Amino acid sequence: MGATKKNLSRRSFIGTSVAIAAGLSLAGGKLWGAPAYIPNLLSPNFTINGVQLGVITYSFREMENQSAEAILQYTLDCGITSIELMGSTAESFNGRPENKMDRRKFYMLSRKARKNKLTKDQEKELADLKNQQTSYDKEIEAWGKNRSLDGFTKLRKMYNDAGVQIYAFKPDYLLSKKNSDANIVYAMKAGKLLGASHVTLELPRDTAHTLRLGKMAEKNDIHVAYHGHEQQNPTWWDSALSQSPNNAMNIDLGHYVAAGNEAPLQILKDKHQHILSMHVKDRQNPGNGKNNMPFGKGDTPIVEALQLMRDEKYTFAATIEYEYKTPENSTIIDEIKKSIAYCKDALES
């Protein structure tokens, strides 16, 4: 491979990537409006020159329909076949009752209450929302006593039949410190049934809890990969990694750059054996504002990181996470396609 190609700047990929994205749209055109979940339509385990490229389904959070079926269709529409699946999607498919409380309003009123800025009508509204949440908590507690794992097996089959593999599972609250061992085991078993090699969550501050999770992961034959935001630094995961071989890393390269870490590629070189998946987004460094940007326009070395993974044959997945604001003349799906094309171009250059 010529040095000229290897040393292309990140921004030089943008024009080529847009063209590739257009190609993906044309190639994937049959998916739009077509019957969903056509078996073997796409190849599972989407890899480019040895690098597994996926998307976290959090990227679809602003889409109106959040059902497992809709999330699958969005994935297919993007032309991707490997995902990190959000827990709420899987649990809803498995029969978890829906929380119909207006959570946005609840959080907004709760913030105002802490500042003593509620009107009398708002005080009544917040009290009603709290009562709704209490009733829902009781409903969930009752459901949890008799819940089954069958839905996760069915969900995996539906996704696999469409050519989509779930390599990571983010079970939200289920892995938190306050949860029972039964809930944690449930989350880990769900991950296994979905086909995931690891479950993900934010790295807890409590080392006793990371020890607990690591030991439970050993018993359930799965790994726990810890995610981070701007708390990330080169030694941030060290305690958890030392506690169990089943504790691992779900590093976020964009947040790592936004945190001001000066050598983002070095941590990949030093700890690749502990990384099971890496979130890929393009954030600016602190000096430039830390904003989420379209791929190629921020300060995150996406091209260099992907090519490092390819050249050194690192085995962890690169998970695209869509977080920047959708342009008025575009859609979430189209922007994710552009991000995929940008990564594809990097890996093929």
Describe each PLM feature range:
Residues M86-T89, D172:
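Short beta-to-alpha linker loops that shape the active-site pocket of alpha/beta-hydrolase fold enzymes
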Residues G2-L24, G29-T81, A90-S110, R114, ...:
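Histidine-acidic metal/acid-base catalytic patches
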Residues S59-F60, W143-G144, L175-S176, L201-E202, ...:
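A generic structural signal for short
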Residues K154-Q165, L194, L308-T315, A346-S349:
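A structural motif corresponding to the C-terminal end of an alpha-helix
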Residues K120-N160:
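Intrinsically disordered, low-complexity acidic Ser/Thr-rich regulatory segments
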Residues S88-R96, K100, K115-N116, N146-I166:
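Active-site anion-binding loops
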Residues S17-K30, N45, K145, G151-F152, ...:
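Active-site acidic/histidine proton-transfer and metal-coordination neighborhood
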